[in-house]
């Protein structure tokens, strides 16, 4: 009885329909190559930035090195040039020590000596110029402390105050630098220097 009922129950269970299978939409997994491509693009951009920075640093280094080499060529003779200037100054002092009257009445020997000293002094100046050292004489110019050193003032109302009226010692430039400032006498008591051209254009054509 029990077996019969049990068998009947089992048959009833098997006869019941199964739950319907609901299909879920298929979701495509992420493309594994997509992340790889983004990483490659990012790495390439970083590598490019590093390369550009390296190239910029190399270019800056090249420019600095070229400037240092150029400065060394231009200004490397500064100390030697100063020593040569002292010799030229001594030769000029020797020439200045000979009065004009003595020169006019000098015999052949003295004239030859004077001419030899003058030639030597000119040769030294020419040699300096070949090496980038140039002489400048600010006579009559407005005093500029960047290029001149004022030794004294000279009362002279005929010229604007602050004008170089006497040059005790000429100045010298090497490249764009002052190797030795000119020693000068500056006027005082004269009229004030004329205003700069920019100040005189007020109301004029721009």
Swiss-Prot record:
Residues 1-15 have a biased composition (Polar residues). GO terms for cellular component: cytoplasm. Pfam families: GrpE. Signal peptide: none annotated. Its main location: cytoplasm. CDD domains: GrpE. Keywords: Chaperone, Cytoplasm, Stress response. Gene3D superfamilies: 3.90.20.20, Head domain of nucleotide exchange factor GrpE (2.30.22.10). GO terms for molecular function: adenyl-nucleotide exchange factor activity; protein homodimerization activity; protein-folding chaperone binding; unfolded protein binding. InterPro entries: GrpE, GrpE_coiled_coil, GrpE_head. It comes from the Bacteria. GO terms for biological process: protein folding. It is found in: Cytoplasm. The keyword Oxidoreductase does not apply. Residues 1-38 are annotated as: Disordered. Belongs to the GrpE family. Participates actively in the response to hyperosmotic and heat shock by preventing the aggregation of stress-denatured proteins, in association with DnaK and GrpE. It is the nucleotide exchange factor for DnaK and may function as a thermosensor. Unfolded proteins bind initially to DnaJ; upon interaction with the DnaJ-bound protein, DnaK hydrolyzes its bound ATP, resulting in the formation of a stable complex. GrpE releases ADP from DnaK; ATP binding to DnaK triggers the release of the substrate protein, thus completing the reaction cycle. NCBIfam families: PRK14141.1. Homodimer. This is Protein GrpE. It comes from Rhodopseudomonas palustris (strain BisB5). The lineage of its organism: Bacteria, Pseudomonadati, Pseudomonadota, Alphaproteobacteria, Hyphomicrobiales.
């Amino acid at each position: 009885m029990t077996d019969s009922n049990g068998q009947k129950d089992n048959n009833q269970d098997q006869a019941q329909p199964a739950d319907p299978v609901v299909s879920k939409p298929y979701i495509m997994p992420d493309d594994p190559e997509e992340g790889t491509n983004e990483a490659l693009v990012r790495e390439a951009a970083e590598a490019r930035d590093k390369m550009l920075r390296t190239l910029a640093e190399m270019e800056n280094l090249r420019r600095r090195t070229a400037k240092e080499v150029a400065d060394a060529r231009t200004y490397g003779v500064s100390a030697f040039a100063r020593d040569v200037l002292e010799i030229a100054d001594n030769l000029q002092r020797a020439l200045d020590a000979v009065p004009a009257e003595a020169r006019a009445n000098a015999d052949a020997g003295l004239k030859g000596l004077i001419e030899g000293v003058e030639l030597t002094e000119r040769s030294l100046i020419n040699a300096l110029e070949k090496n980038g050292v140039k002489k400048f004489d600010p006579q009559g110019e407005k005093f500029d402390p960047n290029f001149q050193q004022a030794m004294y003032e000279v009362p002279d109302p005929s010229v604007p105050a602050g004008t170089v009226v006497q040059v005790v010692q000429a100045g010298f430039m090497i490249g764009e630098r002052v190797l030795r400032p000119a020693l000068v006498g500056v006027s005082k008591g004269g009229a004030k220097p004329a205003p700069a051209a920019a100040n005189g254009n007020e109301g004029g054509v721009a």
